UniProtKB/Swiss-Prot annotation:
Component of the coat protein complex II (COPII) which promotes the formation of transport vesicles from the endoplasmic reticulum (ER). The coat has two main functions, the physical deformation of the endoplasmic reticulum membrane into vesicles and the selection of cargo molecules. PANTHER family: PROTEIN TRANSPORT PROTEIN SEC23 (PTHR11141:SF0). This is Protein transport protein SEC23. Belongs to the SEC23/SEC24 family. SEC23 subfamily. Its main location: membrane. The gene is sec23. Keywords: Cytoplasmic vesicle, Endoplasmic reticulum, ER-Golgi transport, Golgi apparatus, Membrane, Metal-binding, Protein transport, Transport, Zinc. It comes from the Eukaryota. Transmembrane segments: none annotated. It is found in: Cytoplasmic vesicle, COPII-coated vesicle membrane; Endoplasmic reticulum membrane; Golgi apparatus membrane. GO terms for molecular function: GTPase activator activity; zinc ion binding. InterPro entries: ADF-H/Gelsolin-like_dom_sf, Gelsolin-like_dom, Gelsolin-like_dom_sf, Sec23, Sec23/24_helical_dom, Sec23/24_helical_dom_sf, Sec23/24_trunk_dom, Sec23_24_beta_S. The COPII coat is composed of at least 5 proteins: the sec23/24 complex, the sec13/31 complex, and the protein sar1A or sar1B.
Amino acid sequence: MNFDQSEDRDGVRFSWNVWPTSRVEATKNLLVPLGCLYTPLHQSPEITQVPYPPLRCKGICNAILNPYCTIAPPYKTWVCPFCLQHNQFPPHYAGISDLNRPAELLPHVTTIEYQLPTAETPLPIYLFVVDVCVPDDELQSLTDSLTMSLSLIPENSYVGLITFGSMVQLYELGFTSCPKSYVFRGDPPTNTFKIANLMQKVGSPETMNLQSKRFLVPVSECEFHLTSILEEIQKDPCRVASDKRPLRATGMAFSVANALLSTVASNMGGRIMAFIGGPATTGPGLVVSEDLREPIRSHHEVIKGKTKYTSKAYQFYKSIGERSVASGHAIDIFSCSLDQVGLYEMREMVKLTGGYMVLADSFDHPMFTQSFQKIFTREDNAFKMGYNAEVQVCTSMSLKVCGAIGHMSSRNNKTSCVGENEIGIGGTSSWKVCALDQNSTFAFYFEIANTQQNAPEQLGLVQFITSYQNSLGKQILRVSTIRREWVQHTMEQQQNITMLANGFDQETSAVLMARLAVFKAETEELPDITRWLDKMLIKLVSKYADYRRDDPTSFKLVSNFSIYPHFMFHLRRSSFLQVFNSSPDESSFYRFMLNRENVSNSLIMIQPTLEKYSFSGPPHPEVLSASSISIDSILLLDTFFHVLIFHGETIAQWRKAGYDKDPQHQNFRDLLQAPRDDAAHILKERFPYPRYIVCDQHSGEARFLLATIDPNITHTSNTPQDPSKGEIVFTDDVNLHVFLEHLKKFAVQS
């Protein structure tokens, strides 16, 4: 089966593309969850756009007219394939016939966009929340980036500004005579509702709205004034002792931002864009005290439950996220510090609202500047983004949705499509997404509801209905209707297994399992999750591999399953499930990105790609192992978070000798340039901007490569080592070969 075709056309990929006919068969044979990854704003030239509203089923499913509906032109009726409800076509469909069908009924139009004829809403709002406790040079770089963004934001979009240090300042941009701001203390535990009431007192209720143009003003009307304010912003004047951290009221800043937007612009698309240069040390949401002798929490302390502020801060930021969801606004965090800023505590706030999370060393580092600029990249004079969105799932009667994993929040809409079991954010068939872009991808998990052995009479269908406001203020409804086949119940058991195996998508399955493992990591011990992954893998290959009982040498996997164990091996070793070399903030960032990207990007995170460049031939993919390292070649590693160029020992010596500057060694210059060009292409396309590293063999930064590759050559290896090929990795970790041998042993045993 061509799994990529469905992704290219509809932005969806399923783990199983043939479905068993009953719940019993599914329990026995679907040893990876039945699910899919769906990208609502997937861009494809095949997507049809129409300027009229959709036609919905009058039954309980509320599904939308699609190519799989049965129509009766003489009677002007159609039958919904989801609930089998008979519906009447409205008068404007009077000309419908077998030869004259509207776009939504054409067989190839499985994804369609409706432009709803509603009044256009104001363009998205951008509220900047700026940390002024950072060093002067970084503050200058940050304000330069913000000034640059004003030229990229549509001129009719509203913008606002909040700065925070020991105090929080809300700027009244509508007052242009001079910079005017309202100051809030950073330390009292003031809640959002009290702040909203305080704002009502600042101005009468009639003036506390978007049209009043006090705190939120269109870019076209305030660009000069806001630019002058940004140019004059100074570092927080509060004196900081040498043994203290700056007083940083991050929580209060978020409270003020949330109160402003929920009061002034409720249910209008918008973003709270927070630029944070250190941990919160005062007021609600603090993650560490101002005393430098007290270190910020580590993974060890989190696991042991010995953190002082984490639980309370997490609940505080989560409540901010829930209120932002209610008012329809996303929260973005740009964490730019060598120290942790509290992403671990803030992660749920960003996830619930569908915001961005960027992790960088400083505000003048390309990881921040390039990532921030990319957010405002336009295509066809518009941002490819959606705001204030809702994703709804409709299923055939024999299929139920168990839940979703991604950056969204539940609408608590328990319809007939909702299954008994919950996976991820479950108990609902619709989810709120405050902001999404072309890469925003959601994992949906399903269960077979049919209790009979015979195949269901209706088609196996899933319909995704996504409503959102685009960056131009128009209301769009995108509908994707996906069909999959049922296994024929007349087949023998082995034929059923073969048919299921042919429909197995190992790449999508690996990503669905990775998301589920990361979701479990929020509440379960990491060793337990690793054992669960191993157990599920053994069950899967035992069911679908060819082998003789108790004979590991006879074990063989068909091509549809052959790479899946490799994915699981690298997932077990990844930063998602191994936290030894990561801080809680870094782990939160890695897991956050896994839960928002599509299949191809997620696979790069799970099993990074390695490209080899040498004089012996053109560049080619290389196995991710220690044996791929050689002294006379260059490697390009892409982990999604890092892009690394690794020069072998001989290549590094030649480069240091300046051979690439000699016209007689043009081939060597071309060899050095090739990975740089490929790396530049990756950096240009990737969001957020990854860490770019160029290193030599045996250098300190080579550790990024050695920590990623399969350690098939270690200090304990008994085989003789050719010094020109391979690299010894000093680790006790199990390598891929040993992992696969143990897998075969457990899979074939009686």
